């Protein structure tokens, strides 16, 4: 069953019925002011940090679902009937409904009782405000007298405190209303210099700023008293629940239309200009008022929306492809890079599965997000790398996350994840290949614990590698610490207390529990760093880290090979995990992908055998499982992984993040059909026809899909904020299509499915444009046999760097 369709020409997903299996959301904003919005206008907004600067409220896991948002109500003043153009929250039957989720904007349109309404929501580039543009048309044969009511419930800034500290918060809320603008200024008198505002372009028939006055006692968003009676209470909030509502009234002749603009925004005043007059408690509106006036104009809104769409066209021009597969085309050209931008901005902090309170910018997560983002906005990627490096500790370890507002690292989600530092090496390597900006390696960056002074980024990378090589276990494999990439494989935790966090509880000591996965990751990172060292003229460093990579590869093949696949780890007692000798948890996906990606097993047959084991033991029609057999009881020595019911999350689901590692590995060994087959299984567009099973959005990747051990096999969860986005873009574009940036040029080395006759692509790379045509005349899953650059045959598959501003014609033939 489908709930909509793709509009590829407009880069939109069109939802044609409002009752999607779960709310299907989109993100507003691209830089500092952000929001999530569902297909029925649910969601909320924040400035930079969804915990510390939350602008509007939203209630998770609530009944009814998706409660609270950017609501507009229309009321026929002649009959007294009212409804929501977005369906929620009134849920009246609509004669027509459509939601178009686009790139950083959402447009919801509907018709009821002969009145057509369209609401466009977006954040203009460079602004700290969002626009709600309402257009209403009278399609009746008679005049209509209408009222439009807006609704936005303010959060008292700190989302965690707002949801828990009621004894204080019921008495702190403050607002001002001036010239039709509602200003939310809780705590502005004392500790804050920022406020929110809510404005309307129409002369107001009324307003409300106290939620209970707007809704009425014991009423919900579905039947607000003010809307029902058609008259605002003109309430001014003092404590309780500050809320913003405007009442605009207008009359439309048959065929006439009306446009009303609502603005919800955030503003900061300089500390010495907070009040007007100085010394009073009255908000100084002089600086923000010109911004409000400008954006309440229709021509400003129209121009701002054009700029937003133009900016996305420019960003996505970094790579466009035309392949024989529509699902591939729309994901590569639009939705996958769009999701990569969202994960870059949000990390894992804010979605309908992440509350925006407990998680900030994850170290490991954001390093991997760079892989899919760097070609879109290299300058922003550079800034993120330096932020991440400043979260590193002098030991070479790193805080597991930091807050986006303060940039300060913290242990709120635990510490001692021993894979974290290695991802920084790979993130920097991806940036260097895309940009050639080796100057970043000389940039001085402080360590988060300030035990040493600022050091060049190059040294940070060295310490990342040393952190691993200094922490080896009995088999000379890396110690796992609290966990590696798999946060739920907690081999030093031994948690038996109900409610205790596996991520933050104290670990037992003893350097025994080892990770084969980190071994593969280290070999890959050390090899990449050796290449960086070579380019810096540091031959000794390069030789040393190549030797370290070889040593680790030897340890993995000696102690991490189980006969048909790579083992997963050794536990606190030195017992093997991920082995045929285990009753459950015999084979894990992570080391099969990572070890092969690092080159381990490519020359001795281990890689091919490990991938064959993946096909026979882990692959399903919905994707590749993380582990099999799933754990059926809780194992104290394994931790959180065994706490999940079989088939969910890390315990036997299709954990989509790891699937692309196997796609890359299959491409590396020349198996184009296998690589592309795995790609299609979790491609959201390819799963659109089973939306009633998949349930999550068909235009973005989800973190997990329930496995066959689960009652709801095929059901996705945790959509949007997942490393799946970056890694799938890497797998399809860099390894299956084979277009990947390298320091000395652009590699064109596809490994295609045999059914394809070829494809074309346009890649913007270091200022030049590469027009690429790949032909597969014999319909084989082979490698490039012939490569021509501007009509000249080139040996190998590396297209040399071209001068900025030039266009290069690349012709490749698979044979």
Task: Give names to the regions the model predicted.
Residues 741-772:
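Surface beta-strand/loop "capping" patches
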Residues 1-365, 379, 384-387, 430-434, ...:
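Anionic coordination/interaction segments
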Residues 139-143, 269-271, 434-448, 526-545, ...:
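Inter-helical turn/loop segments and adjacent helix faces that build the functional surface
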Residues 788-792:
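Short strand-turn-strand beta-turns centered on an Asx-Gly dipeptide
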Residues 75, 361-366, 370-381, 385-479, ...:
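Aromatic-rich carbohydrate-recognition surfaces in CAZymes
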Residues 351-366, 409-419, 500-519, 575-602, ...:
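Solvent-exposed loop and edge beta-strand segments that line ligand/cofactor-binding
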Residues 149-151, 166, 399-401, 521-641, ...:
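Catalytic cores of carbohydrate-active enzymes
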Residues 320-334, 379, 383, 388-397, ...:
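Active-site acid/base region of carbohydrate-active enzymes
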């Amino acid at each position: 069953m489908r709930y909509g369709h793709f509009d590829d020409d407009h880069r939109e997903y069109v939802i044609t019925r409002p009752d999607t299996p779960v709310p299907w959301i989109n993100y507003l904003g691209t830089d500092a002011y952000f929001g999530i919005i569902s297909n029925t206008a649910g969601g909320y907004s924040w400035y930079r940090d969804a915990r510390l600067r939350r602008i509007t409220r939203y209630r998770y896991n609530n009944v009814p679902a998706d409660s609270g948002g950017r609501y507009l109500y229309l009321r026929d003043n002649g009959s007294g009937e009212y409804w929501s153009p977005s369906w929620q929250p009134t849920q009246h039957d609509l004669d027509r409904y459509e939601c178009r989720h686009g790139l950083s904007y959402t447009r919801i349109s509907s018709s009821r009782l002969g009145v057509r309404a369209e609401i466009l929501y977006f954040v203009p580039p460079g602004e700290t405000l969002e626009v709600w543009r309402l257009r209403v048309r009278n399609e009746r044969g008679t005049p209509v007298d209408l009222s439009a009511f807006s609704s936005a419930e303010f959060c008292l800034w700190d989302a965690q405190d707002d949801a828990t500290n009621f004894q204080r918060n019921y008495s702190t809320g403050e607002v001002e209303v001036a010239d039709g603008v509602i200003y939310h200024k809780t705590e502005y008198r004392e500790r804050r210099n920022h406020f929110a505002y809510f404005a309307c372009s129409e002369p107001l028939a009324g307003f409300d700023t106290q939620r209970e006055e707007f809704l009425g006692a014991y009423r919900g968003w579905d039947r607000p008293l003010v809307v029902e009676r058609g008259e605002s209470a003109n309430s001014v909030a003092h404590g309780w629940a500050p809320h913003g509502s405007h009442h605009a009234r207008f009359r439309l002749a048959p065929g006439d239309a009306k446009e009303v603009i609502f603005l919800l925004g955030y503003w900061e005043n300089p500390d010495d200009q907070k009040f007007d007059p100085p010394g009073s408690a009255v908000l100084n509106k002089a600086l923000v008022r010109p911004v409000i006036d400008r954006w309440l104009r229709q021509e400003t809104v129209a121009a701002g929306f054009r700029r937003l769409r133009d900016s996305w066209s420019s960003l996505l021009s970094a790579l466009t492809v035309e392949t024989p597969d529509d699902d591939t085309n729309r994901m590569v050209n639009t939705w996958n890079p769009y999701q990569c931008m969202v994960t870059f901005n949000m990390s894992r902090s804010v979605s309908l599965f992440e509350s925006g309170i407990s998680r900030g910018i994850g170290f490991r997560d954001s390093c991997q997000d760079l892989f899919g983002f760097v070609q879109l906005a290299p300058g922003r990627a550079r800034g993120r790398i330096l932020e991440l490096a400043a979260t590193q500790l002098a030991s070479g370890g790193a805080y597991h996350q930091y807050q986006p507002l303060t940039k300060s690292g913290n242990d709120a989600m635990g510490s001692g994840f021993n894979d974290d530092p290695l991802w920084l090496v790979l993130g920097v390597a991806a940036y260097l290949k895309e940009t050639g900006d080796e100057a970043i390696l000389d940039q001085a960056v402080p360590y988060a614990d300030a035990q040493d002074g600022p050091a060049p980024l190059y040294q940070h990378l060295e310490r990342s590698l040393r952190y691993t090589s200094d922490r080896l276990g009995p088999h000379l494999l890396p110690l796992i610490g609290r966990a590696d990439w798999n946060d739920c494989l907690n081999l030093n935790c031994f948690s038996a207390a109900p409610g205790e966090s596996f991520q933050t509880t104290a670990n037992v000591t003893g350097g025994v529990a080892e990770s084969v996965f980190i071994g593969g990751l280290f070999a890959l990172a050390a090899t990449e760093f050796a290449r960086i060292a070579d380019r810096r003229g540091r031959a000794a460093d390069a030789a040393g880290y190549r030797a370290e990579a070889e040593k680790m590869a030897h340890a993995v093949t000696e102690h991490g090979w189980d006969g048909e696949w790579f083992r997963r780890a050794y536990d606190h007692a030195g017992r093997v995990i991920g082995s045929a000798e285990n009753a459950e948890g015999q084979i894990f996906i992570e080391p099969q992908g990572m070890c092969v990606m690092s080159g381990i097993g490519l020359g001795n047959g281990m890689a091919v055998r490990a991938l064959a084991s993946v096909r026979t033991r882990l692959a399903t029609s919905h994707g590749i499982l993380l582990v099999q057999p799933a754990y059926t009881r809780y194992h104290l020595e394994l931790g959180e992984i065994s706490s999940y019911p079989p088939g969910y999350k890390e315990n036997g689901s299709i954990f989509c993040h790891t699937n692309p590692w196997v796609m890359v590995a299959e491409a590396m060994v020349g198996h184009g059909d296998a690589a592309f087959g795995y790609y299609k299984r979790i491609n959201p567009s390819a799963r659109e026809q089973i939306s009633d099973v998949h349930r999550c959005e068909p235009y973005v990747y989800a973190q997990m899909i329930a496995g066959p051990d689960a009652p709801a096999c095929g059901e996705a969860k945790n959509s949007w904020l997942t490393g799946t986005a970056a890694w799938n873009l890497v797998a399809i574009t860099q390894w299956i299509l084979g277009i990947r940036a390298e320091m000395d040029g652009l590699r064109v080395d596809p490994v295609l499915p045999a059914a394809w006759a070829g494809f074309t692509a346009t890649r913007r790379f270091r200022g030049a444009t590469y027009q690429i045509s790949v032909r597969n005349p014999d319909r084989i899953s082979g490698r490039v046999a012939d490569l021509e650059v501007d009509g000249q045959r080139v040996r190998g598959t590396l297209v040399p760097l071209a001068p900025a501003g030039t266009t290069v014609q690349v012709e490749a033939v698979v044979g």
